[in-house]
């Protein structure tokens, strides 16, 4: 352990970052689980809530690409300070989530993005993938279960 790891400052900073990431994930789950939102509305809302989970939210921007559409935080622009995670369906990429810092930020030992932030973006992309699948399967399951219900009622 180095001196900073032993100090309360490191522990407190580390805890604050984990709390931000966890709160971000809670907000993401609330958005993804809102049945009133369409997929485009979900993507727009996610670009609004996601920056709060990163180390430098004031310069953090998000873009979600799905199919031919792109949804992004106002002020988003390509940056050398970015991380990406694919949105997949059937194991194939159908889009991506991109988080960027639009200005240079302090580079830690882990890089411009913390390891936990890299895990966070992958988790969010995975949850988006699950939500898309769920949204497409809902009508199929409803249709599939309806005839069965009628058959059982007829007995």
Mark where each language-model region is.
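Amphipathic alpha-helical "output/dimerization" segments
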Residues: 1-3, 7, 108-131
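Signal-transducing coupling segments at domain and membrane junctions
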Residues: 67-81, 103-116
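Helix-loop-beta substructure at the N-terminus of cytosolic sensory domains
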Residues: 25-73, 154-155
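Sensory-domain boundary capping and coupling elements
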Residues: 88-105, 131
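A short beta-strand signature within small-molecule sensing/ligand-binding domains used
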Residues: 78-87, 93
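Signal-transmission linkers at sensory-effector interfaces
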Residues: 2-31, 97, 127, 134-155
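Short, flexible helix-adjacent loops and helix caps
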Residues: 33, 37, 76, 102-105, ...
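Interdomain signal-transducing alpha-helices
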Residues: 19-22, 46, 50, 91, ...
């Amino acid at each position: 352990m180095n001196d900073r790891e032993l100090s309360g400052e490191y522990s407190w900073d580390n805890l604050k970052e984990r709390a931000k990431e966890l709160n971000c994930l809670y907000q993401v789950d609330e958005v993804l689980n809102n049945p009133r939102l369409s997929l485009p509305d979900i993507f727009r809302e996610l670009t609004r809530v996601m920056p709060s989970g990163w180390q430098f939210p004031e310069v953090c921007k998000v873009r979600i690409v799905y199919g031919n559409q792109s949804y992004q935080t106002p002020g988003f622009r390509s940056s050398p300070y970015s991380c990406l995670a694919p949105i997949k369906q059937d194991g194939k990429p159908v889009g991506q989530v991109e988080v960027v810092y639009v200005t240079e930020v302090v580079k830690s030992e882990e890089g411009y993005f913390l390891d936990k932030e890299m895990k966070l973006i992958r988790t969010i992309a995975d949850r988006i993938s699950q939500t898309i699948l769920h949204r497409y399967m809902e009508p199929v399951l409803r249709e599939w279960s309806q005839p069965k219900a009628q058959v059982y009622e007829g007995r």
